């Protein structure tokens, strides 16, 4: 493995970790996923530390070289279980059969690019607001105004 390959791998692992974290994955899951993927790609030892605003990854290889990189997470953390499931499936696939880095990069960015249809979210918000207004003693007109 070349130095450039290892650096690119580390960068892609951070991309994956950031994508998982910002779509709602818990911190332990991100740490475990990045550790397993790094070892699947040839790292002898992985040291991964994740909090909601930062990811630190150190990869140690059998040749004796180590690479460390930190990524600050500034994107808002939301919940998108569909994207999270795609990223989890990608990580499982990579642990079973190692993908080429170019394919890995394409898969990560494809999963992150897909946009979520917010129509159902808006309809649900309207129904919830109107229902709560009526539930807490408002009239039907209050429910419509709240929606």
Language-model region placement:
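Short secondary-structure transition/capping segments
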Residues: 92-101, 142, 146-147
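Short, hydrophobic/aromatic alpha-helical segments in well-folded domains
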Residues: 16, 107, 130-131
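N-terminal loops that bind phosphate or other acidic moieties
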Residues: 99-106, 136
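Cytosolic juxtamembrane amphipathic/interface segments immediately preceding
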Residues: 105-113
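Core alpha-helical transmembrane segments of integral membrane proteins
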Residues: 115-147
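Soluble N-terminal domains of membrane-associated systems
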Residues: 1-98
């Amino acid at each position: 493995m070349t130095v450039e390959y290892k650096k690119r791998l580390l960068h892609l692992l951070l991309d994956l970790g950031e994508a998982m974290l910002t779509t709602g994955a818990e911190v332990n899951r991100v740490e475990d996923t990045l550790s397993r993927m790094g070892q699947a790609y040839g790292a002898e030892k992985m040291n991964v530390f994740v909090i909601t605003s930062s990811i630190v990854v150190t990869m140690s290889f059998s040749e004796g070289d180590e690479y460390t990189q930190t990524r600050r997470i500034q994107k808002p953390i939301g919940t998108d279980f569909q994207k999270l499931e795609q990223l989890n499936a990608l990580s499982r696939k990579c642990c079973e059969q190692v993908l080429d880095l170019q394919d890995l990069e394409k898969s990560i960015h494809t999963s992150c690019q897909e946009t979520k249809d917010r129509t159902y979210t808006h309809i649900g918000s309207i129904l919830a607001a109107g229902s709560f207004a009526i539930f807490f003693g408002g009239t039907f007109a209050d429910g419509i105004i709240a929606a």
